[in-house]
């Protein structure tokens, strides 16, 4: 029977066995370490010399629970970020016609009629500045909307590969998008 265990240790199955060592809070990242064969030796001794039964006798929850939890958290965060981004961007697009119309009408009304020639240039300058500021905000927000998506995807991929996805990054994302939403609205 020991030769059976030795043969399993040398196969790819033994290298694939992992155990998740996580914490109850999300402040520290979960780590995935290789399983010790001693943890499963009592289960392996009861198995006949049939290699296909080895993986079915080892509980799958030990090896994949951390990965499933990580994926659920990751997808929930990505969904939340995309939803907040989309809502802020589309709210701005819905307000765009009214912003442009009000700016144009203000510029037209206060610079041409109901004013003197000296006041004409002052009101025209203020209206033009307001119009340019709103156009600049729209341009920057649309650029940020597409640019931030790429940066977030790249950063999440990097952290996912390195296994460093943790609550501080989530808090940073929430703070960033709250600030963006406040500025846009």
From Swiss-Prot:
Localization terms from the record: Membrane
Membrane topology: Multi-pass membrane protein
Extracellular side stretches: 91, 140-185
Disulfide linkage: none
Topology, Cytoplasmic side: 1-69, 113-118
Keyword annotations of the record: Membrane, Transmembrane, Transmembrane helix
Keyword Cell division: no
Annotated transmembrane regions: 70-90, 92-112, 119-139
Gene Ontology annotations for the cellular component aspect, listed alphabetically: membrane
Additional notes on this entry: Almost completely overlaps VMA4.
The protein, known as: Putative uncharacterized membrane protein YOR331C
Annotated organism of origin: Saccharomyces cerevisiae (strain ATCC 204508 / S288c)
